[in-house]
Amino acid sequence: MYVGKESIDRLRLDEAFAGKIAHLPIADCICVKCDERLLVVDDEETKCSRFGKEGDDVGKALMVINEKKREIVLLSIDNKLLKGIQGGIADCALFDDKQFRFVEFKTNAEGNAQKNFDKATSQLKNTIQVFRDRLQAVDVMFDDAVVLSCHIVLSHNFPRSMATTQNYQYEFATDTGGIMLSFDSETYWEKPER
């Protein structure tokens, strides 16, 4: 049994997302890789997140540095596991037996930066609550089972300031019980995001 399967079983994701809430079964929404460098993209054609491949725009991706080559599960959430969730939902999650990171892509966002930041943080908070509720229904305390964190992936030319991102990070942590929010387009997997 591989780490990804153990993580899915331990979190009881199949049970938590069985029935009417799920658009597709968990098994149809995951991909597992253990490469040293993993690119995660939100596919513009399928409108679903996936691991990247040659030719994908690195400027619109999350690069995961996985030096220990741990198995990382990509769970495609928006338009795959869940569809039409009121309040919006994160694009995907990356996880293993220790960490669970929600990812929201805003790489095509234009115009009002505050509006885009507000929408992305709202979608992430809503996703956290959906997962907390679904997992609690199957007796899994999500926040105790894994280290939770979130990423908002923006295009490199999206306007933002250090003060703005820090304010959003502080507000997000306050609103979610301490969950870290990152705006970096590159992350190290071994370093817990808490």
Walk through the language-model features, giving the residues of each.
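Catalytic cores of nucleic-acid endonucleases
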Residues: 114-155
